[in-house]
Amino acid sequence: MAKQSMKAREVKRVKLANKFYTQRHELKNIISNMSISEEERWNAVLKLQSFPRDSSPSRQRNRCRQTGRPHAFLRKFGLSRIKVREAAMKGEIPGLKKASW
């Protein structure tokens, strides 16, 4: 189990990323637009750098919903491989069964 503080930190990052999404997107468009003057683009870079570090979506980490484990996360289920295996063995995931050949 991950510490509660790590789970809370991840929730905070998601909220910040959602809050600043449109502003970041607009500034990135300005930065990549070559028809805008160099000074305006540089000001956009400085403005983007002034945003909180955790507002960047690349700072987010997928975590298991049950345990908070950050590694071996399966997006399809929202769980780590360990919890997917446990749920599959109990028959809690419809249509999923252990492979045998």
Curated annotation (Swiss-Prot):
| Listed PROSITE patterns | RIBOSOMAL_S14
Q: Name the Gene Ontology biological process terms.
A: translation
> What Pfam families would the database entry show?
Ribosomal_S14 (PF00253)
Family matches, as Gene3D superfamilies: 1.10.287.1480
Q: Which keywords annotate this record?
A: Ribonucleoprotein, Ribosomal protein, RNA-binding, rRNA-binding
Looking at the UniProt record for this protein, which Gene Ontology cellular component terms does it annotate, in alphabetical order? cytoplasm; small ribosomal subunit
List all disulphide bridges recorded for this chain. Answer: none
State whether keyword NAD applies. Answer: no
State a single Gene Ontology molecular function: structural constituent of ribosome
Cross-referenced NCBIfam families: PRK08881.1
Instruction: Give the similarity note.
Output: Belongs to the universal ribosomal protein uS14 family.
Subunit:
Part of the 30S ribosomal subunit. Contacts proteins S3 and S10.
Task of the protein: Binds 16S rRNA, required for the assembly of 30S particles and may also be responsible for determining the conformation of the 16S rRNA at the A site.
What's the protein called, per UniProt?
Small ribosomal subunit protein uS14
Instruction: Provide the species name.
Output: Buchnera aphidicola subsp. Acyrthosiphon pisum (strain APS)
Q: What is the lineage of its organism?
A: Bacteria, Pseudomonadati, Pseudomonadota, Gammaproteobacteria, Enterobacterales
Q: Which gene encodes it?
A: rpsN
